[in-house]
């Protein structure tokens, strides 16, 4: 239950909030898994997100979200129980620079392999050493545009997921259900802020990276890496 404990105690609030907002006491939930009443782990109850916009560069704003603690605990428990399967799917891409890493200490429970845009500088330099151009693309409203029903598509393929859409033996269906329950049943978008969303989004984006890699030779273009973060996904292709 270590991942459940860490996601609750150090991955609940958005990182933009000051340190005075602390959820370290929520780690106790991980020790109460078996003692908690069945209603706590309900798979049918829904809750609403608490949302707040913070300014970004220019005129843009980032819509942060704080989920109901019970709904978030359900999602984190699913990630914890199924981490081996999630990790196996994430590892399919050899070019992603955003693979989520769990940390036992520090301010956050989960960080991407390259946590900050500034840390991409050496990677860009390496890409330039073998080519002339870096192609960069920005995915607008990335988290907000993820369709929760597409989470099982990414994990199990769209064909399988549609054939077994009510089969909760599939991890993707359980994650989809937890995400919807956490945001009043809505299927469009996942909350920006909690560390669990980083795990879900990277798992979802993994198929895109694999598809790019499979088609990475188009004429003189060779894809060397994909490094998405919240709201931006630069793709590096030396020509």
Each PLM stretch: what is its role?
Residues 1-203:
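Conserved two-metal-ion catalytic palm core of "right-hand" nucleic acid polymerases
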